[in-house]
Design a protein with these regions (language model features):
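Glycine-rich loop-to-alpha-helix module at the N-terminal edge of alpha/beta enzyme cores
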Residues: 60-64, 77-85
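PLP-dependent class I/II
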Residues: 2-5, 15, 20-23, 27-34, ...
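Intrinsically disordered, tyrosine-centered linear signaling motifs in cytosolic regions
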Residues: 64-65, 207
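Short beta-strand to alpha-helix junction loop
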Residues: 69-70
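Substrate/cofactor-recognition hotspot
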Residues: 9
Length: 390
């Protein structure tokens, strides 16, 4: 009899939404019109200037490995982006290009977390964060958060939940699934609380750029020793290119470079050269138009769902999600999602994918469809509520 697969693998939970997505695909194959509000991927394709840059890179033979830290031109372009957007002078040496934001999270986890140690994470939160910690034999200390703290960690929560095994905290701003943002003052407070305990602060800034009304502050504005995870997937619309970056303190760069060399050698070369076009004025104009469109979608869907009775206690300031309490409708979140998929062919995500705290009566809607599709989705949801028996 073969040896069993690792306990590590068994401990990493699958996405509940994937079962719903598989069923949605079956329904589509049967000819049903499914409205997808479950997957966190922009519906826009990659902007044309980026595509052209990628095509030019392929034609020019830019298909070989690059340095593990990424091509110098891209690290310099990102450094310039921090200067223009945040007024920050970030040495390009501190920027490592990674295979998606996931690559940045993997590097930070491998560098900072020893076996048996943990980071504090908000619950609800992005599920892969805790799974990456398990992958490096660490753990996530999930901290229940609700609307009273806008679903974010606070210095008081850090003080209450920090223990002998804590080595840091990972926060997200804007956050998935709630869309809430940490202010500059809140980031500074978290930094102070974690430094007082000799820990590391890691901030997921993957949804920076996708904010509505107030720009998100970077933690690097208040803490130059923080680790920042970012990605070309969301604001820049390059999900399938698999490209991200990590900003780290200068003292950590050599260790991170060694890890990168061993874990993935380099990020995809053609994607790196394509990403140089992300920072061109014509591209940024397209991206800002898309941001405005996401804002219009949020401004439609938020009041529409509230009018139907969904309790969305905190208005999202960024990303493209609404996190809704469905307890007033009764029943379990997964069954609720399944009902609307089967009866109305609208797919959204059960809260179980984002943690444990009150997860069974929360769902997440992604406004990654155009306004006519969102309007149709709301009509279907209104109809489906009449037949729901929680």
């Amino acid at each position: 009899m073969a040896q069993p697969y690792s306990a590590r693998s068994r401990a990493i939970e699958p996405f509940h939404v994937m079962a719903l997505l598989a069923r949605a695909n079956e329904l589509q194959a049967e000819g049903h019109d499914v409205i997808h509000l479950e997957i966190g991927e922009p519906d826009f394709t990659t902007a044309e200037p980026i595509i052209r840059a990628g095509q030019a890179a392929l034609t020019a033979g830019k298909t070989r490995y690059t340095a593990a830290r990424g091509i110098p031109e891209l690290r310099e372009a990102i450094s310039g982006f921090y200067q223009s957007r945040y007024g920050l002078n970030i040495d390009p040496r501190r920027i490592l290009i990674t295979p998606g934001g996931s690559g940045a999270l993997l590097l930070a986890s491998a560098l900072l977390v020893d076996p048996g140690k943990h980071w504090l994470l908000a619950d609800p939160g992005y599920p892969c964060n805790r799974h990456f910690l398990r992958l490096v034999e660490g753990a996530a200390q999930l901290v229940p958060v609700g609307p009273d703290v806008r679903y974010q960690l606070t210095p008081d929560l850090v003080e209450r939940h920090w223990d002998h095994a804590s080595v840091g905290a990972l926060v997200a701003s804007p956050a998935n699934p709630t869309g809430t943002i940490l202010t500059r003052e809140e980031l500074a407070g978290l930094s102070t609380a974690i430094k007082a305990r000799h820990g590391h602060l890691v901030v997921d800034e993957i949804y920076h750029g996708l904010t509505y009304g107030t720009d998100a502050a970077s933690v690097l504005e208040v803490d130059d020793s923080a680790f920042v995870l970012n990605s070309f997937s969301k604001y820049f619309g390059m999900t399938g290119w698999r490209l991200g970056w990590l900003v780290a303190p200068d003292a950590a760069v050599s260790e991170l470079e060694k890890l990168a060399q061993n874990l993935y050698i380099s990020a995809p070369s053609m994607a790196q050269y394509a990403a140089l076009a992300c920072f061109e004025p014509d591209t940024l104009l397209i991206l800002e138009e898309r941001r405005a469109e996401f804002g219009r979608r949020r401004d439609f869907l938020l009041p529409a769902l509230r009018e139907l009775g969904f309790n969305i206690a905190v208005e999202p300031e960024g990303a493209f999600y609404l996190y809704a309490d469905i307890s007033q409708f009764g029943g379990d979140a997964f069954a609720f999602c399944r009902h609307f998929l089967e009866t109305e062919h609208v797919a959204f995500t059960p809260g179980l994918d984002f943690g444990r705290y009150q997860a069974s009566h929360h769902v997440r809607f992604a406004y990654t469809q155009n306004l006519p599709r969102l309007q149709e989705a709301v009509e279907r949801i209104a109809r489906g509520l009449k037949s729901w028996q929680g």
